[in-house]
Amino acid sequence: MPVTFTSSSHCTVKSGRWYSWYDGRTWTLASDVDIDDVVALKEAWDSGAKSWSATDRSRFHNDLGYAWTLDAVTDNVNSSKGDSDPAQWLPPLASARCAYATHWVAIKYRWRLSINPAEKTKLASILSGTCGAKTLAIPPRAR
């Protein structure tokens, strides 16, 4: 089902079909999904964005130039994540955790954001355990 909008400005979604890879659910009501900043804004702030210009913070929040930065996910799953990092929260679907950790690392690299010790430990555990041997294409730097 293609996404349709309420007007030509493409600001408000009327209908569509979205797959939430965090929990494996598919939705047809826009009200059932949120657009998730994979690295939440507060997490980015705490990891270095507090020293950025307002323009760079806006670019991060609206980063449409990199496919992994923003995702449509089930609304209550996104709410449960809040501003948590991977040491505090992982997708409920176990098979999504490797991709989530990979996306997290790539986004932090792209935006030159730091990773705290607990976050690093959890990411290393995920990426060296259940993920197996994966190659990550280094994303272009955003700043």
Predicted features, each with a name:
Residues W18-R143:
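Domain-level detector of nuclease and nuclease-like folds
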